[in-house]
Curated annotation (Swiss-Prot):
The keyword Translocase applies. The keyword NAD applies. This is NADH-ubiquinone oxidoreductase chain 1. Core subunit of the mitochondrial membrane respiratory chain NADH dehydrogenase (Complex I) that is believed to belong to the minimal assembly required for catalysis. Complex I functions in the transfer of electrons from NADH to the respiratory chain. The immediate electron acceptor for the enzyme is believed to be ubiquinone. Its EC number is 7.1.1.2.
């Protein structure tokens, strides 16, 4: 029975990832005054399935000098971790009910760094290794601010439980009192998922394709799926933290529809940003975090710690 529950969670996510690739290609196409994929199926709707068949039926080549085990383990680990992160998300019911749901998500997203590092190192290619090192430095750096922002939000809700966050936001979305945190969180999630304008790991001009340069066929598809699963996961988490997730007092039945709609709007913003902005320079990326975001988030954390204490309204601790 539990396996059926897992399948009911994973299959829709995989389908959503497939169509997200199509939406992205269509969006970029129309923003660049062209059509995008429109041959396979009506209006190109079957393009993701054609891509999947093509990738998974090709021969998975690997470099002769690569580390065989790590080379194959890395993409599998990437997708496994990307899908595991969805388990504690209330939509409106989660697969597993965790008291420390947010901490679990943060820990799993930290582990995802290893799949990137292993893939770059196991490929035995200097392009892949430089791309992997960039990705690790970027991800680890931005996780610092993500963790501090999470802590500030948790001080408002008083619990690590994700369902408590929804209860906290019944009267007001947290994006209103904590809008500077929300802005920094959104930009940090862009960097965390290696998306434009922070996609330095796959800088075509200098790194060919980044850490996955030596991958082809199935393993490449797994990395691709993991990236899009992480994008949707981060947007779902943003919805839970700042946009009140599902609660509409007049229509409580529209829980899941609300949640999905807000997540899709944030995902569309990700695609819009990709179509609009050029890539950052690497030193600018690090400067933005360590010299701008980190001091501001620390100041906001002190503010969120001192405010409840000064007003004698410490949030309920569960």
């Amino acid at each position: 029975m539990f396996m059926i529950n897992i399948a009911c969670l994973i299959v829709p996510i995989l389908l959503a990832m497939a169509f997200l690739t199509l939406v992205e290609r269509k969006t970029l196409g129309y923003m660049q005054l062209r059509k995008g994929p429109n041959i396979v199926g009506p209006h190109g709707l079957l393009q993701p399935f054609a891509d999947a068949v093509k990738l998974f039926t090709k021969e998975p080549l690997r470099p002769l000098t690569s580390s065989k085990l790590l080379f194959m383990v890395a993409p599998t680990l990437a997708l496994t971790l990307a899908l595991t992160m969805w388990a504690p998300l209330p939509m409106p019911y989660s697969l597993i009910s965790l008291n420390l749901g947010l901490l679990f998500i943060l820990a799993i997203s930290s582990l995802a760094v290893y799949s990137i590092l292993w893939s770059g190192w196991a490929s035995n290619s200097k392009y892949a290794l430089i791309g992997a090192i960039r990705a690790v430095a970027q991800t680890v750096s931005y996780e610092v601010t993500l963790a501090i922002i999470l802590l500030s939000i948790l001080l408002m809700s008083g619990s690590f439980t994700l369902t408590n966050l929804i209860t906290t936001q019944e009267q007001m979305w947290l994006i209103i009192p904590a809008w500077p945190l929300a802005m920094m969180w959104f930009i940090s999630t862009l960097a965390e998922t290696n998306r434009a304008p922070f996609d330095l790991t796959e800088g075509e001009s200098e790194l060919v394709s980044g850490f996955n340069v030596e991958y082809a066929a199935g393993p490449f598809a797994l990395f691709f799926l993991a990236e899009y699963a992480n994008i949707m996961m981060m947007n779902a988490l943003t919805t839970l933290l700042f946009l009140g997730a599902h609660h509409t007092p007049l229509v409580p039945e529209a829980y899941t529809a609300n949640f999905v709609l807000k997540t899709l709007m944030l995902t569309a913003t990700f695609l819009w940003i990709r179509a609009s902005y050029p890539r950052f320079r690497y030193d600018q990326l690090m400067h933005l975090l360590w010299k701008n975001f980190l001091p501001i988030t620390l100041a906001m954390l002190m503010w969120h710690v001192s405010l409840p204490m000064s007003l004698a309204s410490i949030p309920p601790q569960t």
